[in-house]
Amino acid sequence: IEYGIQHEANHFELLKIKYKKHITINPNQSAEKKCAETIKALKDGYDLIYKAYFVDNNFRGEVDFLLKTKIKSKLGDYSYEVYDTKITKNLRPKHVLQITGYSYLLSKIQGFTPIKMYLIDGANITHDFKVSEFLDYFLYTKDNFEKFLPTVEKIDLYPEKCTFCNICPWLDECERIWVG
């Protein structure tokens, strides 16, 4: 996890050299405040937004970077594309699905689906993907998940340990259940 945070921070330092008008959304505040700050930063037309945060019903996303493009949107004569860093050199489908979700959430605000989205791997290689090639699958998965949620008996849920536990905001709650 520490390597991933450092990898992301290194790219932020590099991007700040190229994109002078930048902002960091404070990650240590409520989801509502992070989302409001992100929307304000989008409307204010920053060239680089670090740690952008989106919420839409059952979905949320914290994007490493949003970079401004010259493609018009409801924000103005510009729009944004998603860039996310991964420490691994072997990108996986789940990484592409993740940035597709971010691009979907971004499209709800800017009124325009980004054309491309990007992953920067652990070897510092930037991989670009067409959002349109993955959006239908993401929406299909999202729709099925939303249909599934009401059918779940919440009393039957039990958290399973996974590789994301160390960075999950629910870790304290899960540990309470595991110990109890």
Task: Please give the residue ranges for each predicted region.
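Beta-sheet entry/capping signal
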Residues: 47, 64, 79-81, 114-118
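Conserved catalytic cores of phosphodiester-cleaving nucleases, focusing on short active-site segments
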Residues: 61-71, 76-89, 102-104
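Hydrophobic, Leu/Ile/Phe/Ala-enriched alpha-helical segments that form helix-helix packing faces
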Residues: 15, 19, 103-106, 110
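Conserved ATP-binding subdomain of kinase catalytic cores across diverse folds
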Residues: 97-101
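Metal-dependent nuclease catalytic cores that hydrolyze phosphodiester bonds in DNA/RNA
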Residues: 1-75
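Short, charged/polar micro-motifs that form catalytic or ligand-binding hotspots
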Residues: 55-56, 87-96
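Metal-dependent nuclease catalytic regions and adjoining charged, substrate-binding loops involved
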Residues: 90-94, 105-178
